[in-house]
UniProtKB/Swiss-Prot annotation:
The gene is dapB. This is 4-hydroxy-tetrahydrodipicolinate reductase. The keyword NAD applies. It is found in: Cytoplasm. One of its GO terms (cellular component) is cytosol. InterPro entries: DapB_C, DapB_N, DapB_N_CS, DHDPR_bac, NAD(P)-bd_dom_sf. Catalyzes the conversion of 4-hydroxy-tetrahydrodipicolinate (HTPA) to tetrahydrodipicolinate. Its main location: cytoplasm. It comes from Symbiobacterium thermophilum (strain DSM 24528 / JCM 14929 / IAM 14863 / T).
Length: 254
């Protein structure tokens, strides 16, 4: 069986480095390309510790990667929104399925790319958070909201995170607001914290008569995203469908 060929955008970023190490070690995967703003022409292993394994050549853009004869089945994009706006549609046009963890896009952008995927018969994923624990937090919170109408979200991240509120918090908020059925939920407040020493943390706090309930997820290591990304890469190639939530991948509806 041929390995899944991955080109990784944002390969030298904080999450990208973790994913690069995972992809060069994971059976059934081959990291065939790396895209980064700096280090073009160098081997990724010179820029990112890959555990002694060789890496692909770094390119400044997906177009450069393809022009150099690069081939990939999946684009994994954990870059920034500005770069993603160029890389993601280029990948789809090249029949490379996008698995996107980059956030900060304007409303409607991911829907446009999803439509492009469907038109070309490609799978794709535009998911704000690939941590399996966050997926379960949303699932549990949606269930709890049936019994606790009063709820607020607190999301806490490292000081350099660009978007606030986080894409994950906004996704959680949207699920809670639409998940109450006929109970007409009010808008769910979201509070953002950006401090040194934090990595990625989210709490959903419910209040009721004489009690509170807190559902919390902590990701002190960016390795938390690896299992979800690998699972989604397999899914987009197998199912050739588009997902906006990791739950759609982990718990597919027939």
């Amino acid at each position: 069986m041929q390995p899944i060929r991955v080109v990784l955008a944002g390969a030298t970023g904080k999450v990208g480095q973790v994913l690069a190490r995972a992809l060069v070690q994971e059976p059934g995967f081959a990291l065939t390309g790396a895209i980064a703003r700096q280090g073009g022409g160098r081997n990724l292993a010179e820029l990112v510790p890959l555990g002694g394994r060789p890496g692909p050549t770094v390119h400044g853009s997906l177009e450069e990667f393809l022009a150099a004869g690069g081939e990939a089945d999946v684009l994994v994009d954990f870059s920034v929104a500005e770069a993603g706006r160029r890389t993601i549609p280029a990948a789809i046009e090249a029949s490379i399925a996008p698995v996107v963890g980059t956030t900060g896009f304007q409303p409607g952008e991911t829907e446009t790319w999803a439509a492009m995927c469907r038109k070309r018969g490609l799978g794709g994923a535009f998911i704000a958070n690939y941590a399996v624990g966050i997926m379960l937090l949303m699932r549990f919170a949606e269930e709890a909201h049936r019994f606790f109408p009063d709820v607020e979200i607190i999301e806490m991240h490292h000081k350099t995170k660009l978007d606030a509120p986080s894409g994950t918090a906004l996704r959680t908020k949207a699920r809670l607001e639409r998940g109450r059925g006929d109970l007409a939920a009010a808008e769910v407040p979201v509070h953002s914290v950006r401090l040194p020493g934090l990595v990625a943390h989210q709490e959903v706090i419910f209040g009721g008569l004489g009690q509170t309930l807190t559902i919390r997820h902590d990701a002190p290591s960016r390795e938390a995203y690896v299992p979800g990304v690998l699972m989604t890469c397999r899914w987009v190639l197998r199912e050739k469908r588009v997902a906006f939530d990791l739950e759609e991948v982990a718990f597919p509806r027939t």
